[in-house]
Amino acid sequence: MLLLKNATVYPQTEKAPFVGDVLCENGRIKEIGKDLSADDAETIDLTGLNLLPGIVDCHSHAGLGPNGDVATLSYCTDTANPVSPEMDVIYAADPTNGCYRWAIENGVTTLGILPGSCDVIDGTGFATRTWGSNIFEMCLKRNICMKLSLGENPKGMFQNKNMEPDSRMGVTFILEEYFANAKAYMDKKDRGEKVDYNEQYEVAIPVLKREIPARIHCTHNDMAAAIQCLSKYNLRFTIEHAWGSSNYLDEIVASGCGIVYLSLIHISE
């Protein structure tokens, strides 16, 4: 056990900070209060120091780029196919990248690492600690979400390759087509009908069953389309970056979706 004594504690459950103690066991907070004691605990005196909860950065590309960079599009998205749900971004994450050191030194203790936004269906994300050297040991949970993208990023990527989609409506069509086909595949399985195994549709099943959320890169140009499309399948979803969301407040509230703005970690060494 670890006992942190005499810090100015800023707990999430209290209205005001107080001078007190935090007792940890097996890497988790066991008790917060004043005058705590534990005979077998390592004790550290934090008199004059502040003790705050770690910051969670829920949308990050940290460690997906080279040489300490957060990421570049070519590193954090596989662009061979605009529909790439089977891509798992944990295989691209490098915890020796300088971003992780910068994060922990500045109080960011947990990251939601997502694929980039060059595809329409980009892949799955994971949650990780920011300290360690083996990303699989650092990982808190795999497959926390499916990353989707609308707008200029997939449009521009595949337009430059003379591939579909090369328009905003083409991007939305591919998104709709994917979930329609994945739902038909899932429904057949649920009815006990024989289906040929399809990994791309298998990845969509926990999304369609609301077990994990879809997280859609989207700005004001495509926000109404994103809400309409994902609400049609009753998905849990968040709009990522969400520039111009003030234009769609009523639609956002009615859909029950979440909003995530910018990542906390966008630095290069």
Task: List each model region and its residues.
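N-terminal metal-binding scaffold of metallo-dependent hydrolase/deaminase domains
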Residues: 1-40, 47-51
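Glycine-enriched alpha-helix->loop->beta-strand junction motifs that scaffold or abut catalytic
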Residues: 230-237, 253-260
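Generic beta-strand/beta-sheet core signal
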Residues: 12, 61, 114, 217-219, ...
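Hydrophobic faces of well-ordered beta-strands that scaffold small-molecule active sites
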Residues: 56-58, 111, 146, 214-216, ...
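Active-site-adjacent beta->alpha loops and helix N-cap segments on the catalytic face
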Residues: 244-252
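Metal-associated gating/positioning segment near the N- to mid-region
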Residues: 49-115
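Conserved small/polar residues in nucleotide/adenosyl-binding loops
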Residues: 265-269
